[in-house]
Amino acid sequence: MLKSVIENVHALEIFDSRGNPTVEVFVTLSNGVVGKAEVPSGASTGENEAVELRDGGSRLGGKGVMNAVNNVNTEINDALKGLDPHDQPNIDATMIALDGTPNKGRLGANAILGVSMATAAAAAKDNHQPLYRYLGGTDLEMPQTFHNVINGGEHADNGIDIQEFMITPVAKTSFRDGFEKIVNVYHTLKKVLEDMGYETGLGDEGGFAPNMKNSEEALKALHESIIKAGYKPGEDIAIACDCAASYFYNKEDGKYHLEGKVLTDEELADYYDKLLDEFPELISMEDPYDENDVEGMVKFTQSHKDRIQIVLDDFICTNPKLLNKAIHEGAGNASLIKLNQIGTVTETLETIRLSRKNGYNTMISHRSGETGDTFIADFAVAVNGGQLKTGAPARSERVEKYNRLLEIEEELGKGERLAFFPDNVDLD
């Protein structure tokens, strides 16, 4: 039987959950098998992320992606024809070399990632395997999910500076059991917010976007909702935050402008300590300091690494070189993993391996501009990612991922392994 090879790579411009253009890619093999991928995009982006190629000009507010689409349909298609779709490292290395820039800025990370993901999808189909099995083999684990149920910062038009307030099921008997707990708290939260006099419109990631005064009020609403839903804060459901501190850091004075206050590194740490003392169920903080504030991040890690999970997002941008630097500096104890920050499946896997080797947890993540593509659900299971965040249990582009995880759990059958976090954090 002849080995299948890539016959054609084709892209077109589609739209994401924010109504912005993005790239969809189809990889067709010589035996007729087709793999498809849709590329997400972020609103809160790190300085060191791989570059999305946007068209500029007046069409679609300058956000069109026809140049990226054309790059797929011409240069990338020509370069990949005849290659083995099962050799993912070679596919990705070929595109990186073809691009020739350190940030994928010539062809576009949105073009390259779409092809990388679609190739993996095609190869899995060619093997008659689900994507999670093709990428991950047999020793698989269902991830613990983190759900952004109150949106602030760049993800909502309200007065909260911290970007995401998440809930996570720390006690569960199955993925479905944990997800049902989250759904119960989510619906309870809506009623709690209404009783507090807030509107319950949704932000980009399906969470509510109430115009609250400060982050403490958001945490109080979550705490109350967990209890009213019939659960114990910290024992059944815990809380996590994405601070996205780069968005309230002022480069001119080197201080953090947060909720009407101007704070130094030390004062910001005191502010976080106040929240942690008041809400011991708060177990994880993402990007608590600006992506260039190495001193602040390292000091906070030294003083808090045994108390909470400190997740690096903008600080490392899923880049193994930046992660290696953070490891040597002693920053953080967990890595946020976003495929489109680095731009290929292979490089994403490299960052995950480096994280594991150095004792860092990993949290696979969606972006605020999403599509119905469920690649990251399979990916999180395949790499035993441990943790996954992909929004609230609302808006179809978010729920599609959770529904895919429910399908995967059913396919794995009884006895599937569950990721649990925290296992090193004292919640008493």
UniProtKB/Swiss-Prot annotation:
Keywords: Cytoplasm, Glycolysis, Lyase, Magnesium, Metal-binding, Secreted. It comes from the Bacteria. It is found in: Cytoplasm; Secreted; Cell surface. Its cofactor is Mg(2+). Mg(2+) binds at residues 242, 286, 313. The active site is at residues 205, 338. GO terms for cellular component: cell surface; extracellular region; phosphopyruvate hydratase complex. It holds the Pfam family Enolase_N. InterPro entries: Enolase, Enolase-like_C_sf, Enolase-like_N, Enolase_C, Enolase_CS, Enolase_N. Its EC number is 4.2.1.11. CDD domains: enolase. (2R)-2-phosphoglycerate binds at residues 163, 338, 367-368, 389. Binds a second Mg(2+) ion via substrate during catalysis. GO terms for biological process: glycolytic process. HAMAP family: Enolase. Catalyzes the reversible conversion of 2-phosphoglycerate (2-PG) into phosphoenolpyruvate (PEP). It is essential for the degradation of carbohydrates via glycolysis. Belongs to the enolase family. This is Enolase 3. It comes from Lactobacillus johnsonii (strain CNCM I-12250 / La1 / NCC 533).
